[in-house]
Regions:
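Domain-scale signature associated with acetyltransferase and cell-envelope carbohydrate enzymes
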Residues: 1-151
Length: 152
């Protein structure tokens, strides 16, 4: 049982302290709607991820390995976005919009050397996009993905 619990925690955050902090902040302010919630998350989520400026993060955004996420200035994460940034992380450039229920997922269980997701500036990741970064995915500046795009 303890082995299973350790495996679960290892797949959620870099360590137990980060897991507790991330989950506490998500539980406290992750659900708050409107501009009030966006404002609270813009300030408090800087404790668990790298932010180059203010970002608008809607309610219901799920984060795993938040310490491996970098958001540029003016990034927008819509409702239901899921960012899983293990191990080499996710970087989202200034002014980029990640639309609702998009999933950017880096879980490098095969230990591939170039895993990660890098999205340039002023890009758009459309609704319900799935981007898997195990082999490394780089998306340039001003790239627009339609809804339901999958990059594996």
């Amino acid at each position: 049982m303890l082995k299973d619990l350790k495996l679960y925690l290892d797949r959620q955050a870099t360590n137990l302290g980060h897991y507790i902090l991330e989950q506490t902040l998500l539980a406290l302010v992750g659900w708050i709607p409107s501009i009030v919630g966006i404002g609270l998350r813009a300030v408090l989520y800087g404790l668990i991820m790298k932010m180059d400026g203010l970002a608008a993060i809607e309610e219901g955004v799920r984060l795993r390995f938040a310490s491996h996420v970098r958001l540029g200035k003016g990034v927008y994460l819509d409702q239901g976005v899921y960012l899983h940034a293990c191990p080499n992380g996710i970087e989202i450039g200034d002014g980029t919009l990640i639309m609702h229920h998009a999933e950017l997922h880096v879980y490098n269980f095969r230990n591939m050397p170039h895993s990660g997701i890098w999205v340039g500036r002023n890009s758009l990741i459309g609704e319900y996009n799935v981007i898997r970064g195990q082999g490394g995915v780089t998306i340039g500046d001003r790239v627009y993905f339609a809804p339901l795009v999958q990059v594996l």
